[in-house]
C-alpha cells in the first residue's frame, strides 16, 4: 500500500493542476481500446508510454492498465525505461509483456584500454552524457561536468574568457607534484602542460563534439594507467556517425550577454571627500590633493560583454563507412574591457569497417586555433583603491606624457630626460583605465590532435582481438605583449615581450585481448599490451624596453633572451584480467609497469597492481521475489598508482643554468656567462598512492530511483616535494626529494530520481554528495612546516601552511582577541606559548580552504515540447582569507603615502584599525571567513519542434530554441566578491596545492543566453 500511495499522489496532483491540458485529446472521435502491460515476471508496469504514428496517446496506470483512442489494427508502440520497445496491433483487450532491454543492460562504458558493460563494472566509475537540454554557457569541456559527478570538484580559474579550471577528483593526491587528473581524448592521453593561449587539455576539444565523459576514480579502475592515474582519469569520447544512415546536417548556436554580478563596496567621491576631511581636516595638505570628480572606477573598467558560439555538423554513414565532420567558432568578449577570446575548431571522424567487420578503423582528426586578448588584470585592484575624486583624463600638461590619463605624478629626477618632466609616484595606485588601454597583450595558439585506431578480430580465432592506436598532439603558442611608454606600469621605456612555446606528444599502444565464454555460465577475458610515449617541449622568449628619446632613441633597453627545451619518455607494459561466474560474481585484476626517463637507473621502473570484486546481489535466488529492487551490486577494490608529474624532466642529474642578469657576465661586462649549477637528487623515485574502495550500486522500483555509494581511503607516500637541505650540501636551499605522506578518506554518493513519467510529463532529478577528509601525515626531515599563501606584506607574510596532522589548505594565523561587543582589538592576539613575545610560535592552525562537503543537484522537467532545467552546486566547510578585508582594515591607509591618496571601503570605518607596522595585525583568524556557498550554475527553458516546413519531398526541420541564465545567484556568508577562490596566482606562477587567498581575480559574470539547435 505504501508503494501505491507514493506513486499515486503526485500523479493525482499533476492531473488536478494540468487536467485541462492533458484531457483535450479525449474529445477525439475514435474507437477505444484497452490493455494491460506487465514485465516478464507478471508484475504490472506503471508509466509505460503508448504511441501511435509517432504521437503519444496514453500511459499505463498503477496497475499497468491503459485506455486509448485508436482504431483496431493501428500499430501501437509501448516503451518503458530499461525495457525493449514493444510493437503490437491495437485490439479490444490486450495483454502486453515487456522484456528487459538487453542493450541497455549491456550498455558499454569506455574504460582504460577498452570498454566494459556498465552492469559488469567492479571499480568506481561514473559515465555521463552531457545534458544538451540543461546546461549553461559552455566554453570549455570542464563546464559540462561541474557539479555533475560525485567526488569531482571543478573550480574555474577566473571569469576571464577562455580561462581554464582546477579539477580535483577525491581531493587530489599530492602536495607538490601534480593534482590534475589524466585527460584521455579518444584514446590519446593528454599532458597537463599547456602552451601560450591554451589553458588546459580540455580547451582543445569543442564541447559540442563530446559524446560522453567517463570518470575513473578509484585505483582499481585507474591503475591500468599506472604512473598517470593517481589523480583519477577523465576519458572523453567524441561523437561519431552511424553506418547506413543518411547524411544529416545540424546547426547549434547561441548569443549571450554577460555582466558584472557584484562590485566591491567602496566609497564614492562625496563619501571619500567627507572621510578625508574628517580624518585630516578640509584645510590639510591631503585634502588639497583631492579632485572634484565622482568617478566610479569599477564601472569604468567593466562592460556588458557580447559573445556567440556557432557549430555546424555533417554526419551519416555508408554501409561500412560512418563519418562525422564538424566546425565550430566561439567568440567571447570579457566583462573586463579589452579582454577577448576567439576559438575555431574542426574535427573529422571516419570509422571504416572491412573484412566482414573483422577489421575496424577509428580515425580522428581535430584542429583548434585560439586567439586571446588579455586584459591587464591589475586594473581590477586599482579600480578598488584609486581615488574616486579624480577624473579619467585631464588636459593638464603634466599628464601629456601619460596620454592624457590622470595619474599621481611627481617631478622627475634632475638626471632624467628633460622632455619627460613628470613621472608616476612609484608607490601610488595607477589609473585603472590607462592600465587597460596601454596594454596590448595577445596570444595565438594552434593545436592539432589525431589518432588512428585499428581493431582486428582475427579470422579463425574470433575470440582474439588485436588493437593498436597511433596518436599524437602538436601545439604551438605565441604570445606578444606591447605596453605603451605612457603606461603607469612601464613608464618611459614601455615593454615588449615575445614568447613562443611548442610541444608535442606521440603515443603508440598495442594490446591483444582474448574473450571466452565457457560452461554456459562463465566468462573470461584477458588483455596484455605495450605503450610508448614521448613528450617534448621547447620555446624562447625575448623582452625589452625601447629608449624613446635621446642618443639611444629607438634602441632596446634592458633586453633579455632565453631559449629552452625539455623532453621525457615513458615506456609501459600492462595487462588486465576479467572473470565472471553466473553473471553474478566478477573479478578484475590489472597490472602495469612504467619506465620513466625522469628517474635515475635503479629507480626508473614503477609497478602498479590492482584488484576488484563485484557481486550482483539482485541476481541471487533469494532476491528474485523482491520486485522493488531492480539492481543491487556490491564492489570492493584495491590498487596502487604512481606519480611523476610536476617535478621536471632532469632533476635526478646535474644541470647548469645560464643566468640572464648582467652581473653574471664574465669577465665583468664581457660576453661570457658564469653558468650556475642547479640542485639535483639522483635518488628520486616514484610517488605512490594506495587506494581502498567499497561501493554499492542500486536501482529501485524499475529504475524510478537509482544511484551509488562509495567509501574510500587513499594514502600517498614518498611525496615528491621541494624539501629544505643543509647549507653547502647541494646547489640550493631546497631540493626535490621523496618525503612525506598524505591521506584522503571519504564517502560519496549519487542518486537519480524519476518521480514523474507520463505521456506528457517527464521529470528527472539527479543529485550527488561528497565528503572528503584529508590530512598531512608526514613531512620532510623533522616535520618542519612548509608555509605558503603570500598575502603581500613582505617577508614572512604567508597565511597558510602544510603541517603534520593538519589538513591541506590549513590557515596559519594568530588568534584574534575581541572586546565585549565582538569588535577585534588591534594588535591583541593570543600569546599561545605564554612567553610575553608575539612571534610565529604564537600562530596556530585554523580551518582549511578545502571544503569537506560538496553537493550537486540537477533537475529537468519536460512537458510535451517544453523543457525546464536547473543546476545547483554547493560547497560547505571551506574558508577563505579575505585579503581585501585585510588590505582595507584601517581608514588611515587612504593617506599613508607621500603625495598621493587611496580609496577605501565602508568596512574600514567599522574596524577602524590604526596604521601599524605589526604583521600580526593582518595575519589573524579574523580575516579567515566561512566561504561555504550555494550556487545556481544555470537555469534553462527550452522548446523543441519537429516537421517544420515539411513537404512532399522534405521531412521537415526539427530543433530546439532555448534561453539560459548562467551563474545566476550565490548564497554565502562570505564578505568578498566570490567565495569560490581558485588556486591561481595573480602573477601566473605555479598555483598552490589549494586556493584560499582572495586575490580579487577576474570576476565570474552573470550570463544570459539565447540559443537554437536545428536539424535539417
Feature annotation, model-predicted:
Residues 2-368, 376-377, 420, 424, ...:
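Short, small/polar-rich motifs associated with maturation and membrane association
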Residues 31, 37-38, 60, 183, ...:
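Hydrophobic alpha-helical segments, especially N-terminal targeting/anchoring helices
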Residues 50, 78, 183, 579, ...:
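Short aromatic-centered micro-motifs
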Residues 133, 180, 273, 280, ...:
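Extracellular/periplasmic, surface-exposed regions of secreted and cell-surface proteins
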Residues 142-146, 734-743, 783-811, 845-856, ...:
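C-terminal extracellular loops and terminal segments
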Residues 187, 805-813, 819:
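Extended ligand-binding clefts on enzyme/binding-domain cores
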Residues 835:
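Acidic carboxylate motifs that coordinate Ca2+ or other divalent cations, activating on Asp/Glu
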Residues 848-881:
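Glycine-rich, aromatic-lined ligand/substrate-binding cores of catalytic
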Amino acid at each position: 500500500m505504501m508503494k501505491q500511495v507514493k506513486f499515486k499522489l503526485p500523479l493525482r496532483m499533476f492531473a488536478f493542476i494540468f487536467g485541462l491540458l492533458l484531457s483535450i485529446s479525449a474529445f477525439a472521435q475514435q474507437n477505444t481500446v484497452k490493455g494491460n502491460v506487465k514485465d516478464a515476471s507478471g508484475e504490472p508496469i506503471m508509466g509505460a508510454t503508448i504511441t501511435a504514428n509517432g504521437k503519444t496517446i496514453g500511459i499505463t496506470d498503477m496497475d499497468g492498465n491503459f485506455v486509448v483512442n485508436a482504431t483496431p489494427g493501428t500499430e501501437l508502440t509501448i516503451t518503458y525505461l530499461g525495457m525493449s520497445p514493444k510493437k503490437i496491433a491495437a485490439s479490444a483487450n490486450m495483454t502486453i509483456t515487456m522484456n528487459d532491454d538487453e542493450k541497455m543492460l549491456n550498455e558499454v562504458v569506455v574504460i582504460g584500454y577498452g570498454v566494459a558493460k556498465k552492469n559488469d563494472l567492479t571499480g568506481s566509475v561514473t559515465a555521463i552524457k552531457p545534458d544538451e537540454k540543461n546546461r549553461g554557457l559552455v566554453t570549455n569541456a570542464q563546464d559540462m561536468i561541474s557539479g555533475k559527478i560525485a567526488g569531482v570538484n571543478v573550480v574555474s580559474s577566473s571569469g576571464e574568457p577562455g580561462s581554464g579550471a582546477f579539477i580535483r577528483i577525491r581531493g587530489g593526491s599530492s602536495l607538490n607534484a601534480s593534482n590534475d587528473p589524466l585527460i584521455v581524448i579518444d584514446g590519446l592521453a593528454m599532458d597537463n602542460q599547456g602552451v601560450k593561449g591554451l589553458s588546459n587539455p580540455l580547451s582543445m576539444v569543442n564541447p559540442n563534439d563530446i559524446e560522453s565523459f567517463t570518470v575513473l576514480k578509484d585505483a582499481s579502475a585507474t591503475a591500468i594507467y599506472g604512473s598517470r592515474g593517481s589523480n583519477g582519469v577523465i576519458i572523453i569520447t567524441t561523437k561519431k556517425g552511424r553506418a547506413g544512415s543518411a547524411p544529416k546536417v545540424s546547426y547549434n548556436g547561441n548569443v549571450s550577454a554577460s555582466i558584472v554580478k557584484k562590485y566591491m563596496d567602496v566609497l564614492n567621491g562625496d563619501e571619500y571627500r567627507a572621510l578625508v576631511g574628517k580624518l585630516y581636516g578640509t584645510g590639510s595638505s591631503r585634502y588639497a590633493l583631492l579632485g572634484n570628480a565622482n568617478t566610479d572606477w569599477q564601472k569604468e573598467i567593466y562592460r556588458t560583454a557580447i559573445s556567440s558560439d556557432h557549430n555546424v555538423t555533417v554526419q551519416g554513414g555508408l554501409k561500412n563507412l560512418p563519418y562525422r565532420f564538424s566546425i565550430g567558432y566561439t567568440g567571447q568578449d570579457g566583462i573586463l574591457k579589452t579582454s577577448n577570446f576567439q576559438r575555431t575548431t574542426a574535427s573529422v571522424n571516419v570509422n571504416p569497417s572491412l573484412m566482414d567487420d573483422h577489421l575496424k578503423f577509428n580515425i580522428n582528426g581535430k584542429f583548434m586555433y585560439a586567439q586571446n586578448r588579455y586584459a591587464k588584470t591589475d586594473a581590477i585592484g586599482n579600480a578598488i583603491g584609486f581615488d574616486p575624486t579624480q577624473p579619467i583624463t585631464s588636459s593638464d600638461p603634466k599628464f601629456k606624457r601619460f596620454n592624457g590619463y590622470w595619474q599621481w605624478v611627481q617631478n622627475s629626477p634632475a638626471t632624467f630626460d628633460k622632455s619627460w618632466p613628470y613621472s608616476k609616484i612609484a608607490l601610488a595606485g595607477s589609473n585603472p583605465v590607462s592600465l587597460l588601454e596601454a596594454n596590448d597583450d595577445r596570444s595565438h595558439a594552434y593545436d592539432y590532435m589525431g589518432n588512428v585506431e585499428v581493431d582486428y578480430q582475427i579470422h579463425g580465432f574470433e575470440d582474439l582481438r588485436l588493437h593498436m592506436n597511433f596518436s599524437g598532439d602538436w601545439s604551438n603558442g605565441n604570445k606578444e605583449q606591447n605596453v605603451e611608454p605612457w603606461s603607469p606600469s612601464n613608464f618611459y621605456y614601455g615593454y615588449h615581450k615575445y614568447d613562443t612555446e611548442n610541444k608535442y606528444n606521440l603515443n603508440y599502444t598495442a594490446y591483444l585481448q582474448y574473450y571466452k565464454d565457457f560452461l554456459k555460465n562463465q566468462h573470461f577475458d584477458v588483455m596484455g599490451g605495450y605503450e610508448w610515449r614521448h613528450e617534448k617541449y621547447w620555446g624562447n622568449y625575448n623582452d625589452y624596453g625601447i629608449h624613446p628619446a635621446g642618443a639611444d632613441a629607438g634602441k632596446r633597453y634592458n633586453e633579455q633572451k632565453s631559449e629552452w627545451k625539455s623532453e621525457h619518455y615513458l615506456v609501459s607494459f600492462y595487462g588486465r584480467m576479467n572473470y565472471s561466474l553466473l553473471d553474478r560474481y566478477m573479478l578484475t585484476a590489472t597490472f602495469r609497469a612504467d619506465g620513466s626517463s625522469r628517474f635515475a637507473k635503479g629507480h626508473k621502473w614503477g609497478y602498479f597492481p590492482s584488484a576488484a570484486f563485484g557481486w550482483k546481489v539482485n541476481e541471487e535466488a533469494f532476491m528474485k521475489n523482491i520486485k522493488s529492487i531492480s539492481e543491487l551490486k556490491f564492489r570492493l577494490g584495491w590498487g596502487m598508482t604512481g606519480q611523476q608529474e610536476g617535478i621536471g624532466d632532469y632533476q635526478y642529474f646535474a644541470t647548469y643554468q645560464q643566468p640572464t642578469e648582467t652581473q653574471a657576465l664574465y669577465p665583468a661586462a664581457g660576453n661570457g656567462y658564469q653558468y650556475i649549477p642547479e640542485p639535483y637528487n639522483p635518488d628520486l623515485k616514484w610517488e605512490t598512492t594506495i587506494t581502498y574502495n567499497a561501493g554499492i550500486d542500486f536501482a529501485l522500483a524499475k529504475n524510478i530511483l537509482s544511484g551509488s555509494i562509495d567509501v574510500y581511503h587513499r594514502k600517498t607516500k614518498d611525496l615528491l616535494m621541494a624539501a629544505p637541505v643543509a647549507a653547502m650540501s647541494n646547489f640550493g636551499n631546497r631540493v626535490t626529494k621523496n618525503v612525506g605522506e598524505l591521506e584522503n578518506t571519504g564517502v560519496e554518493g549519487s542518486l537519480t530520481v524519476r518521480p514523474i513519467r507520463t505521456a506528457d510529463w517527464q521529470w528527472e532529478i539527479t543529485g550527488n554528495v561528497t565528503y572528503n577528509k584529508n590530512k598531512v601525515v608526514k613531512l620532510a626531515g623533522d616535520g618542519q612546516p612548509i608555509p605558503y599563501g603570500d598575502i603581500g606584506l613582505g617577508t614572512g607574510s604567508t597565511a597558510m601552511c602544510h603541517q603534520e596532522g593538519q589538513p591541506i589548505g590549513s590557515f596559519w594565523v594568530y588568534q584574534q582577541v575581541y572586546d565585549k561587543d565582538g569588535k577585534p582589538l588591534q594588535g591583541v592576539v593570543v600569546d599561545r606559548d605564554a612567553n610575553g613575545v608575539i612571534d610565529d610560535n604564537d600562530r596556530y592552525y585554523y580551518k582549511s580552504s578545502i571544503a569537506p562537503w560538496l553537493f550537486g543537484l540537477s533537475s529537468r522537467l519536460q512537458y510535451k515540447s517544453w523543457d525546464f532545467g536547473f543546476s545547483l552546486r554547493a560547497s560547505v566547510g571551506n574558508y577563505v582569507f579575505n585579503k581585501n578585508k585585510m588590505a582595507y582594515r584601517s581608514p588611515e591607509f587612504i593617506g599613508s603615502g607621500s603625495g598621493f591618496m587611496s580609496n577605501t571601503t565602508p568596512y574600514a570605518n567599522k574596524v577602524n584599525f590604526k596604521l601599524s607596522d605589526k604583521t600580526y595585525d593582518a595575519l589573524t583568524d579574523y580575516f579567515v571567513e566561512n566561504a561555504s556557498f550555494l550556487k545556481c550554475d544555470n537555469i534553462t527553458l527550452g522548446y523543441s519542434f519537429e516537421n517544420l516546413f515539411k513537404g512532399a519531398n522534405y521531412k521537415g526541420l526539427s530543433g530546439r530554441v532555448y534561453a539560459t541564465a548562467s551563474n545566476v545567484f550565490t548564497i554565502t556568508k562570505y564578505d568578498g566578491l566570490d567565495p569560490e577562490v581558485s588556486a591561481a596566482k595573480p602573477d601566473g606562477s605555479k598555483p598552490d596545492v589549494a586556493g584560499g587567498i582572495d586575490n580579487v581575480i577576474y570576476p565570474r559574470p552573470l550570463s544570459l543566453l539565447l540559443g537554437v539547435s536545428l536539424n535539417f
